[in-house]
């Protein structure tokens, strides 16, 4: 083969290898579920909606937490749920004919669970708002009729900030995961 032909092949593979490095997608496998849900009665609340309302200020369409199943500050874990109904404000428009709970509302539900943990643990009445989210992955759908189980594991708890690993589970399957950072505002 001619010398120039080898030269062009080398250039092609050099360019392709750089291109490949830039556009490689890293696939991240889902984490294990943060709590053993099989050991819990997922239909039994230890905190009902009326008690939640004494701690969490959200109301009407933004009330995203229906109950709490487990609260264990020693282990740094709280488990709650959102019963998703056909009457949710987003059902009509997200997505017509095939309603799917928006991911931002899944995160909001988890954030409200984290706020409950923070306020009960610290006895701080100040508002804990979003300081950030990180490493969020959506892995499944939530539809009307589902019970979205929410799990939050406290990673850091300070006077003005809290960090939680969070997950959402429907029918034993992980539907989202991410880190929620709360800041006193």
Segments from the language model and where they lie:
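Flexible glycine-rich active-site/ligand-binding loops centered on an Asp-His dyad
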Residues: 101, 168-185
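Flexible, low-complexity linker/boundary loops enriched in proline and small hydrophobic residues
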Residues: 28-69
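Acidic, glycine-enriched active-site microenvironments
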Residues: 140, 158-176
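N-terminal amphipathic/basic-hydrophobic helices that include classical n-h-c signal peptides
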Residues: 1-28
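Active-site helix/loop of acyl-thioester processing domains in fatty-acid/polyketide metabolism
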Residues: 68, 100-124
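Hydrophobic beta-strand-centered segment that forms part of the acyl-chain substrate-binding groove
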Residues: 28, 36-46, 113-151, 175-177, ...
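Catalytic strand-loop segment that frames the active site of acyl-thioester-processing enzymes
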Residues: 60-101
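Residue-level recognition of beta-strand microenvironments
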Residues: 71-73, 141, 155-157, 183
